[in-house]
Amino acid sequence: MDIRKSQFEENIWYLLFIYSEIAAALWVHIFFFEITLRDFIDTKLQRRYKRLDWWNQPGLLSKREFLQIQRVLNRSNIDELKYQVRTLLPLSFWVALLTKRYFTKVWLNLHLDSLCDGRENFHLRANEILALRNLIAHHREISSRNLIRDHAYLGELTAILDPELAREVEKRSRVLDLLLNARLVGSGGGI
């Protein structure tokens, strides 16, 4: 009985190591997607509104998003124009700017429609990535997710924003090899 228990525990530890490696490999993709998305939106809105502090454009942001920026600025005690505020805002802020509420004020100014299959699909996929990011960041279980789909979404969205960067990230990625290894182990998860 002790032998079975130790074998069972060994299998559990092995799966935990595989999934932690997959999470680490996915984090590289998430990192590049997050910085690419925030830089892309920030740059486009700076150009559109001809100001570094585009969030102060009257009527642009909802009260919630505006207060989120104000909290970040107050907490950081910085001069908002001398610092890149975009680096302090969470991915959830940038994904919120892709919602239907911001269709005219943000989405149309990003000029992404010709590059992707619409705001709704882009937002849906970005929201899936946000959920995956939060699971990984909080050391939660990811084995029940469709990780192949998540990996594809990361590649697709990053390629829309910066095709060259997406190719470089994919060239160095270990995600698919790790996912294949996890499948061979027969984890029974959502891979």
Predicted segments — roles?
Residues 1-191:
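Amphipathic alpha-helical interface elements
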